[in-house]
Amino acid sequence: MGNSKEYLAELALYRNDPELARTIEEYALQGDKNAQYALGLIYAEGRGVQYNPVESYAWLTAAIMQGDQDAILLRSMIAEVLSSEAIEEAEERAAILMMHEDSFANQH
C-alpha cells in the first residue's frame, strides 16, 4: 500500500469526497503530519473541499513544522499563487492549527 501519506493523498484525490476530507481533517487536527500533508494537497486541488490555497499553505506549514520534508515542495508551489498578505494569513492559520494540536495532545 505504500506509506500512509501517499495512501491518504491518493484516496482523497481519487474520491473527491467531502466526508473523506472531514475524516482526514480530524486526523490532521490530532497532529498526524501525513494527514496534514494530505489535507494541504486536497485544498490545493479542491477535491472534496473548496479550492483554498491559503488553507492548503497553512496545513502544509503545519506538516513542515513537524518535519515533513515532502510538504516543502508543494508549499513552495502554492506560495507562487499567493500574495505576501495571503502567505502571512496562512502562517497565522498554521500557528493556530499547531496550538489546537498541542491542546489535543495534552488531553490524551
Regions found by a protein language model. Give the residues of each.
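Hydrophobic face of amphipathic alpha-helices that form TPR/SEL1-like repeat modules
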Residues: 2-9, 38-45, 76-79
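Terminal, low-structured helical/coil segments at or just beyond the last alpha-helical repeat
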Residues: 2-5, 15, 27, 77-108
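Alpha-helical protein-protein interaction scaffolds
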Residues: 40, 56-65, 71-78
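Intrinsic-disorder/low-complexity detector
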Residues: 20, 24, 65, 73-74, ...
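Short helix-capping/linker turns of helical repeat alpha-solenoids
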Residues: 2-3, 16, 29-33, 45-47, ...
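Alpha-solenoid helical repeat scaffolds
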Residues: 25, 29, 54, 58-61, ...
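Structural signature of tandem alpha-helical TPR/SEL1-like repeats
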Residues: 12-22, 50-58, 85, 89
